[in-house]
């Protein structure tokens, strides 16, 4: 599986070619996503949740558990500033965009799905799509897209802040700075006044 991170649309800025067992593949893909996506402050009701990691868990486990391993098509996870796109070869059970309300889950690799459920990398069949919808709406305010065909495609829309890097052009320049002595003096003055 290839993981690609883009800042410049003309070339990828980071790449991880993952050729290992399913468990290690899962870990590397999650880490790649965490490296390129910010953990935004997201509330589910009154509880702060890590929507980024929950989305990654669902799309990575779905890709690994439902991929057609007899195909030579390389699975991909591409992260750019607008979306995450995951593609994998597929034994199609239908064609076109999947509708959450009409979706009927179909196990493509039941043995892999069962192992993933047993070790906690996936939940019951079909819950991944519901969870991805829920956490994508919390993370980006939009709906994900699932397209079934010979290539299964998952598209997770992103807010600009989800991929912004700290530093560089985002840091103001020429900001007046105080020496530590000046800062200490200012703090003491404020304490005396307070």
Model-derived features: positions:
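C-terminal regulatory or interaction extensions
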Residues: 1-194
